[in-house]
């Protein structure tokens, strides 16, 4: 079939018509190695084309979630990330250093693994940090990172991402489940390419250790 995966540590995958030709392609998230896109040629054969499409990101990618959020006729993708795990575990020596007259900072070689958390005024401790999630817009066969301009880039320990139109305005919104010390996010689609996190005004309670979410009309009210 042409799908081999090499020796990458695959963490999540989705079937979606990425090239908009009427058949399902396969997109695979890999941990700390390039993500893979296998395009379906319609005969049971696939070819790898992640670099060509701008989808060969290298990060702590976990789950891809496809949706045509901008309603232009092709599928965009939200890449959920989690965190990097340092080989050998936590370092013996503190991974941060003191800065004269200011807050301590994480040493550059540890910055993708750890962050500083203020435990009390002037007292800091080490904390594992989640990686920033990515929103990639499909611009006719080439994906563009619009995470910052869309307002959807959030660092967290993401575990699932669910698209659905929660406010019934015809635009797909996004619910992101985060684990550990990170709150969930509910990104309302503003219709102009930007999103607003409305979680605190819409959802009264979130567990702060979410691992999955789904949506449905439970009370059958439309």
Question: Which positions does each model-derived feature cover?
Answer:
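Acidic, glycine/proline-rich Ca2+-coordinating loop motifs
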Residues: 1-222
């Amino acid at each position: 079939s042409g799908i081999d995966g090499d020796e990458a540590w695959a963490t999540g995958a989705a079937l979606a018509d990425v090239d908009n030709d009427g058949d399902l392609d396969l997109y695979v998230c890999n941990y700390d190695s390039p993500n893979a896109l296998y395009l379906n040629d319609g005969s049971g054969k696939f070819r790898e084309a992640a670099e060509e499409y701008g989808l060969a990101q290298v990060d702590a990618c976990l789950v891809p979630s496809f949706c045509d959020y901008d309603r232009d006729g092709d599928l965009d993708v939200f890449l959920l990330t989690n965190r990097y795990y340092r080989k050998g575990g936590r370092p013996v020596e503190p991974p941060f250093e003191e800065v004269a007259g200011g807050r301590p900072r994480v040493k550059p070689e540890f910055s993708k693994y750890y962050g500083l958390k203020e435990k009390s005024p002037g007292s800091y401790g080490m904390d594992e940090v989640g990686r920033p999630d990515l929103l990639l817009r499909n611009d006719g066969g080439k994906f563009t990172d619009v995470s910052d301009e869309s307002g959807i880039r959030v660092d967290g320990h993401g575990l699932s991402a669910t698209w659905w139109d929660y406010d019934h305005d015809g635009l797909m919104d996004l619910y992101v489940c985060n684990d550990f010390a990170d709150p969930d996010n509910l990104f309302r689609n503003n219709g102009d390419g930007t999103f607003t996190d409305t979680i605190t005004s819409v959802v009264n309670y979130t567990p702060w250790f979410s691992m999955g979410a789904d949506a449905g009309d439970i009370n059958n009210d439309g």
